[in-house]
């Protein structure tokens, strides 16, 4: 038995090299802005002998539009589990993953993977990359000065018109993502976050239109991080990790801008971003090798340490800096996760209605 284990250990580097050698050429990745540690990509290129061409987007609508047109040319994409990933699975737009080429699949947290299995039975088409919540990015120094009793852990802070009017002078923003914003508004209104009911959508639109005159911007993810970090805005509805990135940049700038994140106490929108391979990917072998490389604990620790989003590889946690590992805004406590909701996947008709709603919201003043 010992000899067999020793032989397996001796052969392991050769087996890994062989698996990576089977995936040659160029890997085309399409991912969110500021959503990976560049050093991880560089290590993959060195070890696999595969050049990575890396493009970025800052909204799910941009990603889905590119994939819906077909022949995107990408080997790896990173759609959010619901609704984008769910729709792509249903449409047959994603390739089933070859688990034999992804031995590090075993590192994934089965509890989290079970959450996405409802839209991808058997987890055949995707592995969780990173996850997080949608909540409030707050410039704490300004908001506390303006309103010491402000309800920082509630969407009331932004969505109640009288509160928005009170804080408008220091800059308010909502990320340009109907997929993420509308479910949060519906939840705040006490409605089903995945509702297709015309009355529910009208109520959500009314809330957004009442907020619109007080907004300084409706930016994409990357621009919103910059606006928070520089203090241009003081309250934003956005992704948890974007706020944490903005807080880190603000500290580095040393100008006294203090940024914090608050998940709504009534329940936050929980999302999972998935590593997936388009059905017409030009280099699926390289895609499987890249997914396997990312699922190494050391890779995921480096990524979480850089972008400040939690990952789904528990073995990476001991490798994280204590300040990251123990930060409840990065890894929420179990009680907060129990209150969180995954918004579900609206029907195509409901999605079209939401898109029209969002267009009217953006165009209004």
Predicted stretch roles:
Residues 95-106, 253-269, 278-281:
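Short beta-strand->loop
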Residues 24-89:
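Early extracytoplasmic/lumenal segment of secretory-pathway proteins
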Residues 80-85, 89-216, 222-225, 229:
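Extracytoplasmic ligand-binding site segments that recognize negatively charged/polar headgroups
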Residues 83-87, 235-256:
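A ligand-binding cleft/hinge motif common to bilobed small-molecule-binding domains
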Residues 334-365:
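Conserved C-terminal helix/tail region of periplasmic/extracytoplasmic solute-binding proteins
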Residues 137-142, 187-190, 271-283, 302:
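A bilobed periplasmic-binding-protein/Venus flytrap-type ligand-binding module shared by bacterial periplasmic
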Residues 278-339:
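Mature extracytoplasmic/periplasmic domains
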Residues 201-211, 218, 255-276:
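Periplasmic-binding protein-like
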């Amino acid at each position: 038995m010992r000899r067999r284990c020793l032989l397996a250990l001796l052969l392991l580097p050769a087996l890994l090299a062989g698996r990576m050698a089977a995936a040659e050429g160029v890997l085309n990745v399409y991912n969110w802005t500021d959503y990976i540690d560049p050093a991880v990509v560089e290590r993959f290129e060195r070890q696999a002998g595969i050049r990575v061409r890396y493009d970025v987007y800052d909204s799910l609508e941009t990603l889905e539009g590119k994939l819906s047109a077909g022949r995107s040319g990408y080997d790896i994409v990173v759609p959010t589990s619901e609704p984008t990933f769910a729709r792509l699975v249903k449409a047959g737009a994603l390739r089933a993953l070859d688990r034999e080429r992804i031995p590090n699949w075993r590192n994934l947290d089965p509890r989290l993977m079970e959450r996405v299995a409802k839209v991808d039975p058997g987890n055949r088409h995707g592995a969780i990359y990173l996850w997080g919540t949608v909540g409030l990015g707050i410039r704490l120094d300004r908001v506390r000065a303006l309103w010491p009793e402000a309800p920082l852990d509630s969407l009331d802070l932004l969505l109640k018109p009288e509160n928005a009017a009170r804080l408008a002078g220091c800059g308010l923003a909502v990320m340009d993502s109907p997929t993420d914003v509308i479910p949060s508004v519906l939840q705040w209104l006490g409605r089903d976050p995945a509702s297709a009911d015309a009355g529910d959508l009208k109520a959500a639109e009314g809330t957004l239109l009442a907020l619109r005159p007080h907004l300084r911007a409706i930016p994409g993810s990357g621009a919103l991080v910059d606006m928070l970090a520089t203090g241009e805005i003081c309250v934003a509805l956005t992704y948890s990790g974007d706020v944490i990135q903005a807080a880190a940049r603000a500290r580095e700038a040393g100008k006294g801008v203090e940024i914090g994140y608050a998940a709504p106490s009534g329940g936050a929108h929980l999302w999972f971003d998935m590593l997936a391979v388009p059905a017409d990917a030009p280099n699926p072998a390289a895609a499987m090798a890249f997914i396997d490389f990312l699922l190494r604990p050391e890779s995921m620790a480096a990524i979480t340490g850089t972008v400040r989003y939690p990952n789904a590889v528990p073995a990476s946690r001991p490798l994280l800096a204590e300040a990251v590992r123990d930060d409840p805004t990065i890894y929420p406590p179990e009680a907060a996760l129990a209150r969180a909701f995954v918004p579900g996947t609206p029907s195509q008709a409901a999605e079209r209605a939401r898109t029209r709603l969002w267009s009217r919201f953006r165009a209004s003043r």
